[in-house]
Structures are given as C-alpha cells and as structure tokens.
Amino acid sequence: MNSNSVLRESIDIFFVEGHGFAVYFYILVILAPVEFLSLYLPSLDAQMWSGSASLFKVTAVTTLLLTVYFAMRVANQEFASWRFRTLKRWHRENGQPIFAIAQAQLLFLSLHVALSLLLCAPLLIWAAAIARTPFSMVALTFGLLFFYAWGYATWGLFALALWERRAESRQVFIRSFFFTLTILSLLVYLPLNPIAFLLAILSRQEFPPLSIAGYNWPAGILHFSGHFLFIGSALLAHQWALRKELRR
C-alpha cells in the first residue's frame, strides 16, 4: 500500500488533510435520525415497518442507500477534487502505469466503503439488538452492504476516467445512473433491486423463480449473476476508459 503513490495521495487528502471527513459526517447525520425516528414515530406500514421488529430493516436499507450514493461520489472525486493530481500527470510525469492507477483507485474505494460501514456498525448493531436479529443475518447484511456499495461505485471510477476534465458531466452521470438504475431494477425484475432483495432476506421471504426457456431460475442466482455481470462490466469499462484517457 505504501509503495503506491496514487493510493497514498488519496489517503493523505481524505484522512490526513481531513477533506473526506465530511462524507462520513453526512452518512451519520442522516442515518442516526432515520433510525431513531423509525423507532419512536408511528409506523409507515403496519405490516412491514411496525415498531422495533423492523428497526434493523429500516437502518439496513438507509445504510445501503447512503453508502452506495456516497461511495459513487467518492469514486467520482467529488470531494476536494482540486487536490487530486490528474490521471495524465500520474501516468506521464510520475511514471505510474495504468494498472497501478486502477489498483490504487479500487483499493481506496475498498478502504472508504469499509470505513463507512465501520462507522455505521454501532447503529446497525444497536438496531439488530432491539429487533433481535440473529448474528448470522447481521453478518450477511454487512457483507451485502459492502458488495453493493463497492460494486456500484466502480461505475463512479469509470465516470472519473472517461470525463476527468468535465466535472459537471461526471456529476450528472452519477446521479442519473444511481436513480435510473434503482427505478429500472424495480420495474424490470424486482429481485434484481438490491433494496428489495435485502428486505426479502431480512424478512425471510423468497421471491418466486423466473421461468426462462422452460427452466425455473431461482431469484437469488439471477440476482447475484446479474450483479457480478454488472460489476464485471464496470471494471472492464473502467480499464477501457483509463487506457483511452491516458493514451490520448
């Protein structure tokens, strides 16, 4: 980690200089009130969101939305963007190969997502204790939250590489991508939506299988197959955008 100058720059800007602290403040200042209000205010739905039994669901879904959204923005360098060296400068002036730049971006994204979940952990664990959620379900939730936040944010890295010199284009893409994908997954096939899938797991409900070519495909297999394809496409697109930008 110490030998990668690109990664070290991101760590210095976010944690040494403190430019990234605002991200974690935003996450906590939104998550904490939602959790407390969902416990003490009247329920929104008597069957799904009633009282303490659903507290962990509310907290987990809110954490999912916040971590995915802010991870995409961090990957897109929307915080303290003026402090980061450009990709071309790293490649041409500092001699950093494309692989090292991509590796540093992915490692820092992993670090950011892990830290975000670590900060949210006390609230999630407290909600799980009140809702009497089994430890195995809590551990599975943390794994899914990391998987979704990291996977979706890789498209932020793609936007950064493709439109590095056009900050407004990147910001519009990230926000449009986030909301469009959420809505489309609800309309096309509900189990593909991470919110619906997470709620189904926490509620111990199973989606009906999808019949394709005379074979019934389990919803879980379709969900993870679709997401692995989605994330794999993002990683390939990120590499392609880096090569395109750095070879101009």
Predicted features along the sequence, with ranges:
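Hydrophobic alpha-helical transmembrane segments of membrane proteins
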Residues: 1-86, 98-248
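Glycine/proline-centered hinge or cleavage motifs at structural transition points of membrane proteins
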Residues: 94-95
